[in-house]
């Protein structure tokens, strides 16, 4: 993924996040609670038909937790304050993300034992996925008030408009010009 302004590669550490004009319309503030559980161990997930990115991130809580980690959130209480999720579901999702090596735990308090949750390299590599989904949402799920989150590329100072490009020719990828191989 590259910045369309300066054409440099962009990592999650190269970007700052700011609330945009559409932030007040974030549907996560609606306190809807549903009970659901995802298998939290590889063995349990191995019993499912598919074990892939969609199974890991297709759950709204897991995807939101990872997105918040890119914003600098790293404690259970901080995730819980931001998301209207039941504590047992949040604990389950954090356990899943640690088991899948998306997060690693670092103790910050001994009694009672509490952890900071940090993105691993594997987790940080999900950044282009989230930026691409944000761009899609900004285009197709607009409320008319503007984007809820604005990204700035720290290196060049421009608003980030990321492009996924071919690693061979450097051109932006167009869905009709990409073929998937099995």
Name the predicted role of every residue range.
Residues 1-34, 142-182:
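C-terminal regulatory/oligomerization modules of transcriptional regulators
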Residues 30-54:
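Short, Lys/Arg-enriched N-terminal segment that forms or immediately precedes the first helix
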Residues 100-113:
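Beta-hairpin "wing" of winged helix-turn-helix
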């Amino acid at each position: 993924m590259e910045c369309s302004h300066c054409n440099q590669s962009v990592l999650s550490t190269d970007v700052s996040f700011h609330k945009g004009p559409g932030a007040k319309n974030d549907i996560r503030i609606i306190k809807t609670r549903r009970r659901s559980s995802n298998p939290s161990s590889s063995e349990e997930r191995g019993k499912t038909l598919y074990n892939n990115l969609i199974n890991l991130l297709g759950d709204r809580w897991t995807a939101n937790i990872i997105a918040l980690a890119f914003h600098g959130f790293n404690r259970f209480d901080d995730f819980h304050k931001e998301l209207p999720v039941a504590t047992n579901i949040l604990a389950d999702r954090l356990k899943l993300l640690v088991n899948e090596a998306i997060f690693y735990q670092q103790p910050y308090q001994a009694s009672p034992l509490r952890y900071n949750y940090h993105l691993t390299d594997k987790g940080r590599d999900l950044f282009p996925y989230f930026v691409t989904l944000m761009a899609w949402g900004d285009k197709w799920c607009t409320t008319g008030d503007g984007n809820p989150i604005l990204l700035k590329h720290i290196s060049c100072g421009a608003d980030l408009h990321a492009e996924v490009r071919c690693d061979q020719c450097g051109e932006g990828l167009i869905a009709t010009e990409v073929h998937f191989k099995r």
